[in-house]
């Protein structure tokens, strides 16, 4: 797969923006150049035991993080001795300063692309604790209003598409699908609009199309938009989308808690896959979805574990798309 020089430049600039967020977060800390802030007491609990550890997860209110909500509902974290609470965030990278300063310990539903690029820029030592979701054909795509005249992927050439973050999994997979369909991505313009604001922007004509995940894709379709293309097809079929991220410092200082969180979350994912009705029950509790919408929304796949192979697949696509990715991802996954 090849991408145009203009698109590579655009993605590279987006990567610099992520790095700027990270540099600002680090420089605003009282710590020196020793690295991200993460005190030994952050999150509570002794380093050798998980019992009594409090973990705050800055989590996106999307279907990606259903496994987290299921794990809380089914008591998997409590069984592991963890006290897990969730704070909703609109963008995963916006939660990075809180992560580095220790007010949250984990980012939930963070797209792999942004955090792999952060690691590659050596401004943030990333530790992936567990996977959140892999995309399926029906739960992630590009939508447009009927009046736009956009009905197929080829119609997106020269258009403006809203994404939650310009340097993330959305731009990468959308470009991959468009390229596979013979569309030049050089003229495609991406603008950052938080997921909750995408439908309003689309209806107001501020963008030609949106690249959205659930429940926001279903909200757009309910508002009259039409699905143009899934972004989980072709080169992006069953693509690993997002995961749960912490700092390597926190994971090293709290190894028992980190491992307990990983295992409880993986139980939550497995339970979510086996009991979709439970997922549909929890969705209205942390997303904007109604119970009626949750009953029919397409669900993704919640992987039981994050593998070097799946993370390497992302890194490979990143490099072919003009983004910077670590050459070795094996050390970034909590064993």
Q: What annotation goes with each model-predicted range?
A:
Residues 1-16:
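Bacterial N-terminal signal peptides that target proteins for export
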Residues 20-25:
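C-terminal motif of bacterial Sec signal peptides marking the signal peptidase cleavage site
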Residues 252-323:
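Secondary-structure end/capping motifs
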Residues 318-335:
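Conserved C-terminal helix/tail region of periplasmic/extracytoplasmic solute-binding proteins
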Residues 35-183, 192, 208, 227-230, ...:
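Short, glycine-/small- and polar/acidic-enriched structural segments
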Residues 66, 70, 74-75, 94-97, ...:
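Solvent-exposed, polar/charged alpha-helical surfaces in well-ordered, non-transmembrane soluble domains
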Residues 27-30:
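Bacterial signal peptide processing site
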Residues 111-113, 190-191, 196-282:
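Pocket-lining segment of extracytoplasmic ligand-binding domains
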